[in-house]
Amino acid sequence: MAHFTLLRTDFVEPPSTWLEAHVACIRPQGSVLDVAAGKGRNARWLAQQGFRVEAVDRDAEAMQAMRDIDGITLQVADLEQHGWPYADHQFDAIVVCRYLHRPLFPHLIDSLAPDGVLIYETFMQGQEVYGKPSNPDFLLKPDELLEAFQPALEILAFEQGPQESPKPCMLQRMVGRKRRS
């Protein structure tokens, strides 16, 4: 008898626990940009909380999982090859989880409204022990988010180091509020 394994392509991971812990920093019903949104684990949850979400990712197929969800606008864009499509936009919050492209850092700041919040979480050096990503280009150095976003942002929360959930990894996490000019 043959055994088959079905791969669920519609499965969406739960939202980032870091995002869940700091969502109260975002203006209620505000506009949120979810960078590298994928299938929308964070965008879906944010929309359910009443936020107006713009989800951007280069993978149009993955983003199709969100096409019929109220409160989410989809933008297919390769941010590494074709630049930043939000030069004329400002958001109440920008969420970046498990994605790193350092040339975007200044654009993230510019696209935050005054008092807007950046919630960032991605892998850092030491992740090589746990698996991918292991390429140093995709791993933050210790304190790199702090160095990249101060003084433009007031740092509200920061942590770095090993995380056990949902699976062991090495993360750097930051929440920062854009200072008024």
Regions from the language model: what does each represent?
Residues 30-38:
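Conserved class I S-adenosyl-L-methionine
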Residues 112-114:
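Helix-to-beta-strand junctions that scaffold the AdoMet/dcAdoMet cofactor pocket
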Residues 116-123:
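Conserved beta-strand signature within the Rossmann-like core of class I S-adenosyl-L-methionine
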Residues 163-181:
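Core SAM-dependent methyltransferase catalytic element
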Residues 84-93:
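A short acidic, Gly/Pro-enriched loop at the edge of an enzyme's catalytic core
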Residues 70-82:
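Conserved SAM-binding strand-loop segment of SAM-dependent methyltransferases
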Residues 59-61:
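Conserved SAM/SAH-binding beta-strand->alpha-helix loop
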Residues 1-27:
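S-adenosyl-L-methionine
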